[in-house]
A protein has these predicted regions:
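Ordered hydrophobic segments in well-structured contexts
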Residues: 23, 95, 142-145
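Long, charge-rich low-complexity segments
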Residues: 28-46, 130-150
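A generic secondary-structure signal marking the coil-to-beta-strand transition
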Residues: 20, 55, 90, 140-142
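Catalytic core and acceptor-binding pocket of nucleotide-sugar-dependent glycosyltransferases
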Residues: 50-133
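Conserved catalytic core of nucleotide-sugar-dependent glycosyltransferases
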Residues: 9-84
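Short beta-strand-to-loop acidic/aromatic patch adjacent to the donor-nucleotide binding site
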Residues: 1-9
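Short, flexible loop/turn elements at secondary-structure junctions
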Residues: 6, 98, 148-150
Length: 150
């Protein structure tokens, strides 16, 4: 899964020693509503002291199917629980689930990141995006995001 507003600034090795990597951001994100949903729906707490949110991740669809045997039930729960205090993050949920239940399945790799963002009421122009890409081409960052928030 790669978010559409993510730009890779250099080659990233997805696998190491035959295992997929979790990519650990140098940004600290601890958005409590994500952990509230994990606890309510999955009975799962935060397992690590870093975020799994890094705008891209390799998901094992077989594990996802075990985590979510009834997709319709999950959608109903998201709609029922969703509030400013309770939100789903697929990255936090999957990363913490794997860490708890399959701790040797993934490796990890630190990434240097940079984030640009603004509200969608002020859309990015093609020229602005090109300028950000050009400015970061020589920066010591692995990836950067150009978010539009609603």
């Amino acid at each position: 899964c790669v978010d559409s507003d993510l730009i890779f600034n250099r080659t990233i090795d997805i696998f190491k020693d035959g295992k997929p990597n979790f990519f650990v951001s140098d940004r600290d994100q601890h958005h409590e509503p994500y952990f509230n949903f994990m606890d309510l729906y999955f009975g799962l707490s935060r397992q690590v002291d870093h975020t799994f949110i890094n705008d891209f991740m390799i998901f094992d669809k077989n594990i996802c199917a075990k985590m979510i045997p009834n997709k319709d039930h999950l959608v109903l729960a998201i709609n029922a629980f969703m509030s400013d205090d309770c939100l789903l993050s697929e990255f936090e949920t999957y990363g913490n689930y794997i860490t708890k239940n399959h701790p040797d399945l993934y490796g990890s790799q630190l990434t240097k990141t940079k984030m640009y963002g603004r509200y969608s009421s002020e859309p990015w122009s093609g020229e602005e995006i090109k300028q950000i890409v050009d400015e970061n081409r020589t920066e010591d960052v692995d990836l950067f995001t150009i978010h539009s928030w609603t």
